[in-house]
């Protein structure tokens, strides 16, 4: 007797990591800047014959501190991260991203093609956030490689200079990333102080 498979219109739930709830401090790109970044990504894909899904506009960001991954979001870590960020005061600053590369690590079918760049002020903000996180009992990094992920693909692009993407960082945010669902929840944001000349 044969069995018949029925499709009731229910799609399979996305596969998620064992620790799917990520807590991260980041600079989310404002929409006009993100649109410019996606234009650059599209041009790079066309020039290299790459077909890959671009990162969503509202997910384009510069990671400042990857705090932790958990099976569920823990309020005590959210509280400590907010307290750390509250202790850091920063003035608005400019950044410039003018190189594009594909990171060699990761899964062979999911290598990240990114914009590279930054500024001294960005490095300083990241380091001070790291110190504040550590003093609040959390993991904090004191240095990093500033980048903006554009897309993931099995193909790499040749490292190259591009027309600079310049913008002003006016805020940073604590984000709960629901890994595997492509969903960001902004828990709190901090405005940088206006620049005075």
Predicted features, each with a name:
Residues 1-197:
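Histidine-dependent nucleotide/RNA phosphoesterase domain, centered on the 2H-phosphoesterase fold
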């Amino acid at each position: 007797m044969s069995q018949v498979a029925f499709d009731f219109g229910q799609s399979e739930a996305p596969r998620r990591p064992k620790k799917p709830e990520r807590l991260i401090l980041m600079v989310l790109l404002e929409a006009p800047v993100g649109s410019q970044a996606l234009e650059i990504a599209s041009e790079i894909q066309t020039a290299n014959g790459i077909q890959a899904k671009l990162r969503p506009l509202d997910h384009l960001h510069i990671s400042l501190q990857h705090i932790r991954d958990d099976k569920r979001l823990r309020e005590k870590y959210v509280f400590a991260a907010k307290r750390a960020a509250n202790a850091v005061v920063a003035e608005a600053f400019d950044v410039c991203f003018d190189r594009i590369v594909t990171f060699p690590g990761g899964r062979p079918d999911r290598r990240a093609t990114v914009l590279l760049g930054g500024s001294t002020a960005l490095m300083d903000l990241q380091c001070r956030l790291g110190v504040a996180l550590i003093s609040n009992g959390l993991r904090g990094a004191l240095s990093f490689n500033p980048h903006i992920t554009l897309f993931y693909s099995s193909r790499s692009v040749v490292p190259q200079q591009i027309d600079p993407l310049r913008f002003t960082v006016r805020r940073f945010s604590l984000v709960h990333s629901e890994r595997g669902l492509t969903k960001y929840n902004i828990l709190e944001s901090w405005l940088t102080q206006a620049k005075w000349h």
